[in-house]
């Protein structure tokens, strides 16, 4: 009798584990520079409110750099323009200092230390891995872009943050997933 109960409980746990196989709760992203070299990683993890993005990268000019989540999961070097604009399903204006609220993909600047290394943890409360309006699991996917200069938090449309110097695909475009 105990064996049957144990077996039944194991089967139930196995079935319940399969029910939570929807969207991932964490995504590892490889960051590449304009030459195609891997320069680091970003980990995007679902939290109670939004996501936490953990960046570990190197090879950057020391000082502050803008970082944003972009609306397309594609990183065609060298310009990374294929990643589109900032992720913005709430249709806000650019800038964390914007009094009417920022775009969903606007993030605080990251800082490269004297040796060009970036280590940062960023809370992104207006982005989700889970279902909903602000999910980055969409047909166009999403990407992370690091820019050559700091984002000033206000200037439209990109905060005077300069060119895109690193990119990583968080979620691929649906059309790219079908090609595999």
Give the predicted meaning of each segment.
Residues 1-7:
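Bacterial N-terminal signal peptides that target proteins for export
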Residues 19-64, 69-180:
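N-terminal leader/targeting pre-sequences
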Residues 11-12:
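Repetitive helical segments and hydrophobic/amphipathic motifs
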């Amino acid at each position: 009798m105990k064996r049957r109960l144990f077996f039944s409980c194991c089967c139930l746990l196995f079935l319940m584990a399969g029910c939570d196989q929807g969207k991932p709760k964490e995504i590892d992203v490889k960051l590449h520079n304009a030459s195609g070299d891997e320069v680091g990683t970003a980990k995007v993890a679902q939290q109670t409110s939004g996501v936490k993005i953990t960046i570990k990268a190197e090879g950057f000019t020391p000082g502050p750099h803008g970082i944003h989540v972009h609306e397309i999961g594609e990183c065609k070097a060298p310009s990374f323009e294929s990643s589109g604009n900032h992720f913005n399903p709430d249709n806000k204006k650019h800038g964390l200092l914007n009094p009417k609220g920022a775009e969903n993909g606007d993030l605080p600047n990251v800082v490269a230390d004297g040796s060009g290394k970036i280590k940062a943890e960023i809370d992104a409360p207006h982005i989700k891995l889970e279902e909903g309006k602000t999910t980055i699991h969409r047909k166009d996917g999403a990407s992370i872009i690091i820019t050559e200069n700091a984002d000033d938090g206000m200037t439209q449309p990109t905060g005077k943050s300069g060119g895109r110097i690193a990119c990583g695909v968080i979620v691929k475009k649906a059309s790219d997933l079908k090609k595999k």
